[in-house]
Regions:
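Active-site glycine-rich loops that stabilize anionic/oxyanionic intermediates
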Residues: 20-23, 92, 215-216
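Conserved alpha/beta-hydrolase
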Residues: 36-59
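Conserved hydrolase catalytic core segment
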Residues: 87-121
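Flexible "cap/lid" loop of the alpha/beta hydrolase fold
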Residues: 107-143, 183-190
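Helix-rich cap/lid subdomain of alpha/beta-hydrolase
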Residues: 128-176, 180-181
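Conserved alpha/beta-hydrolase "acid-adjacent" motif
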Residues: 218-227
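Catalytic active-site module of serine/aspartate enzymes centered on a nucleophile-bearing elbow/loop
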Residues: 238-278
């Protein structure tokens, strides 16, 4: 009971983790184990067509080529609809998907980690341009699944760890990404009308949101994350921001000390997802 005699709010028992581009739900494996050890049910929904996993998508990337933001939202949203409004935690493209899902009234709270920018975020640092250049250098990549080389992955994702360690991460997790969706994100602010990555930043019915970034992230640098946060400045629903020093795009969710980020995200999400007791 609380001090005024009302029942304590109930905390959620299920967490949904949404992966980003260039990886699959396997990228959450450490977080899943940690959260399950704490008694939570953890779901890691994949994108439509990704059911075969890393090796299958490397051999046949056609499901990647066919992706759209709406089909991903419909797929993951359908899974969340069957749950009792869980917290949603997303990384990279999973971060902007989390923002879109909250805007569509899915989830009781959301954490967007190293988020791909939503439509309207116009900051484009040099390191981000360099990271995405392998995809954006050729307009024909809009119709392809495009991967990174190990060298490109090290710069874009894992620049705070050794090349040897980065190559191990690459071998375990890396798959091609949808060139189309990368281009959607890159051109959204120059295309008339709302695009697939649109979020209503002033949505009064949105659940609480935390945006997390890494100070050394090259592909989604701090300036991008900070600009994304500022777009929520007029929102009535809680919107918080946390930046972790010394962390790159990968080492926010993996690498030494990843537990600090995982625990912070979980504690924030669970606290803000609590509902009044029945």
């Amino acid at each position: 009971m609380t001090d005024n005699g009302t029942p304590e709010p109930t905390a959620p028992d299920t967490i949904v983790l949404v992966h980003g581009f260039w990886v699959t739900p396997l990228s959450w494996e450490k977080w899943v184990e940690r959260y399950e050890d704490r008694g939570y049910r953890v779901l890691t929904p994949t994108y439509p067509g990704f059911e075969g996993g890393v090796e299958a998508l490397r051999e046949d990337p056609s499901p990647i080529e066919e992706l759209t933001f709406p089909t991903i939202i419909e797929h993951i949203g359908g899974i969340i609809e069957e749950l009792d409004k869980p917290p949603i935690i997303g990384h990279s493209a999973g971060g902007v998907l989390t923002q879109i899902l909250l805007d569509h009234r899915y989830g009781a709270a959301g954490v967007a980690i190293d988020s791909v920018p939503a439509e309207g975020v116009r900051v484009t640092p040099v390191s981000q341009i360099r990271s995405l250049f392998p995809i954006l250098k050729n307009p024909a990549n809009r119709h392809r699944a495009v991967g990174f080389t190990p060298e490109q992955f090290h710069y874009a994702f894992a620049n705070t760890i050794s090349r040897e360690e980065s190559d191990e991460v690459y071998e375990r997790y890396h798959i091609p990404a949808s060139g189309r969706l990368v281009w959607v994100g890159a051109t959204a602010n120059f295309t008339p009308g709302h695009q697939e990555n649109y979020v209503n930043f002033s949505n009064e019915d949105r659940a609480p949101l935390l945006l997390i970034g890494g100070s050394e992230d090259n592909i989604m640098p701090p300036a991008v994350n900070q600009s994304n946060v500022k777009h929520y400045r007029h929102a009535k629903s809680p919107t918080d921001h946390k930046e972790f020093e010394g962390r790159s795009h990968y080492t926010v969710i993996g690498g030494e000390g990843w537990e600090e980020v995982a625990d912070y995200a979980l504690e924030w999400a669970v606290e803000h997802a609590k509902r009044p007791a029945a």
